[in-house]
A protein has these predicted regions:
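Surface-exposed assembly/interface segments
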Residues: 1-209
Length: 209
């Protein structure tokens, strides 16, 4: 983590997070599912408009990014209304564009064939559960820092969006893990937020990130 050599930097910790997933769905049985498979669910909810509201129909689509014990982590990708065209939409933690436990989900393989339909027992927000653990080597006490206390969830940079790409952003923080530098273990020394993982990404001013 240090810019120059020396034991002074041995206590530094670098933590990185990207938009790996949006939600964790507890489904019990994950048989037949694999990372990279699609997930669909009947769309529901009410969308406010100008002087009126409308009810969602059609279906939501996402992708499985991880499989745990009875759980799958998913990215929310799009909404396709009944008889309409698929539209890319970002996950909304407190809105209607998210998977929920009100109806089953169907896992779809890479050949667009449904391989499993299961009930969703519960849903949790992936980003809100991500933490960084620091350890003071002198006292052996651990401190937990929640990522959602450091920054908003990573998303898509304007540079990537203009090139029809998504989910390239990443946050990087440098932490005084054991307190040797600041005297306070767990102090965040640097925050580099909303960087891009894209090889050719640029800041709005034109320099590479």
């Amino acid at each position: 983590a240090a810019r120059n050599p020396g034991s002074w930097a041995n206590g530094l910790k670098v933590a990185i997070i990207d938009s790996f997933a949006d939600q964790v769905l507890s489904v019990g049985n994950t048989a037949g599912m694999s990372v990279g498979f699609g997930v669909t669910q009947t769309a529901s909810g009410t969308v406010p408009g100008s002087g009126s509201t409308s009810s969602l129909d059609g279906f939501f689509k996402g992708i499985i990014t991880d499989i745990g014990t009875g759980t799958i982590s998913v990215k929310f990708l799009s909404h396709t209304p009944s008889g309409g065209t698929e539209t890319e939409i970002d996950y909304s933690a407190s809105g209607v564009y998210r998977f929920n436990s009100s109806s089953d989900i169907t896992a779809v393989n890479n050949s667009a064939v449904g391989v499993a339909t299961v009930a969703v027992n519960s849903v949790s927000d992936w980003f809100d559960s991500q933490t960084i653990t620091t350890t003071n080597n002198i006292t052996n006490n651990s401190t937990t820092i929640s990522w959602n206390q450091i920054a908003e969830r990573p998303g898509t940079s304007a540079y990537a969006a203009a090139r029809n790409s998504r989910f390239d952003e990443v946050h990087v923080v440098v932490i005084d893990d054991d307190g040797d530098i600041t005297g306070n273990a767990g102090t965040i020394l640097e925050k580099n937020l909303n960087l891009s993982k894209a090889k050719d990404a640029e800041f709005s001013a034109g320099s590479t990130s």
